[in-house]
Amino acid sequence: MQTYTTQMDAARKGIVTPQMETVAKKEYRTVEEIRQLVAEGKVAIPANKHHECLNPEGIGSMLRTKINVNLGVSRDCKDYNIEMQKVMSAVNMGAEAIMDLSSHGNTQPFRQKLTHECPVMIGTVPVYDSVIHYQRDLATLTAQDFIDVVRLHAEDGVDFVTLHCGITRKTIEQIRKHKRKMNIVSRGGSLVFARMCMTGNENPFYEHFDEILDICEEHDVTISLGDACRPGCLADATDVCQIEELVRLGELTKRAWAHNVQVMVEGPGHVPLNQVAANMEIQKTICMGAPFYVLGPLVTDIAPGYDHITAAIGGAVAAMSGAAFLCYVTPAEHLALPNVDDVKQGIVASKIAAHAADIAKGIPHARDIDDKMGDARRVLDWDAQFACALDPETAKAIRDARLPEDDHSDTCSMCGKFCAVRSMNKALAGEYIDIL
């Protein structure tokens, strides 16, 4: 029996893994199509060998658009019970991935709970954990310290890790020279940048990339190449710093693939609507079709409290134009750690964006549920409409709180007997149409 190290290694050897079979069924594709796409790096199936309860998903522009939910504790909000409520909400609402971005206390028990109990893909950002794991100042951490935390997360079963490998000491010169309005807004990227400035040392994730690849190959961890220089405002979109880093991420993608390590590439950020599609095309060219994982992008800077909407607008265009993976954004973005309701609103907005893009791209069977909704609405079958809804609970609650009168209970309180659907059904059936 032929053995393999990673999903990519298996695919290149002609082996169809159980994970590939699952993805093929979900995506209405042949297993050979999925195997070939994984072999080429155009589809990633993040699936750590230790995440035994995982229900695997494929991430690629030609597949259904997937969404990720960020959560985790901070120094100011450190109740893991609340974070587990967010986890359950994410799983129940159909999110395909969860990233634990915890930045306070002992993070390992929560991370292990996720990989032992949660069926969706789990991701982390090891650089966050480095400072709190060792309880030492950033400047005192060695390159080996950072590498060991990557190994710890891999051993704990996380399916993908965001690593800010693309910024180097050259980036310090670029940031100072080009004077961005928002500098670096990536939390992980800013930590790497700060350490380089304080110590004079190179980015450990870049300098020791081959050692990190060995870890990822051993445990089959997908690398999500973090974009430290993603634009944090419209003024910085598609600038020299962003593109220079993207070119380096393309080079690192080749190196990872040479080790049979799967790759996703992270992208912006804050981007004007007219630049979103172009950003997707640039990434596809530079990174050779590796799955693109975008934060939003947010298409305006002026909507704190509503950034789940600005991100959904950008996310729909991005996914339609080639992005494979959307990181959700909540109403609390730029303001606070999201609460349970914020998380739900963020998931709904991102799921709408992903679904709308899948319809536009012609993803197999993406529109089936919309057609079922149309059928249910035509016959005023409310239970069937709720069954088709992205969020049935909310839809039913709104209707139940404002029911129409009994003599037109098949309609809603917006139109009552003026309901166009009711009138057309009666007219086409040859029935008398009572309005008053």
Where are these regions (language model features)?
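Short acidic alpha-helix initiation/capping motifs at coil-to-helix transition points
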Residues: M1, A11-I15, P404
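Catalytic or ion-coupling anion/metal-binding cores of large enzyme and transporter domains
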Residues: E173-C197, P231, A235-A237, L337-L436
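C-terminal catalytic subdomain
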Residues: I302-A311, V317-I363
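Alpha/beta enzyme core
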Residues: T6-T300, Y306, A312-F325
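Basic/polar N-terminal segments that are highly enriched at the extreme N-terminus
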Residues: M1-T5, L436
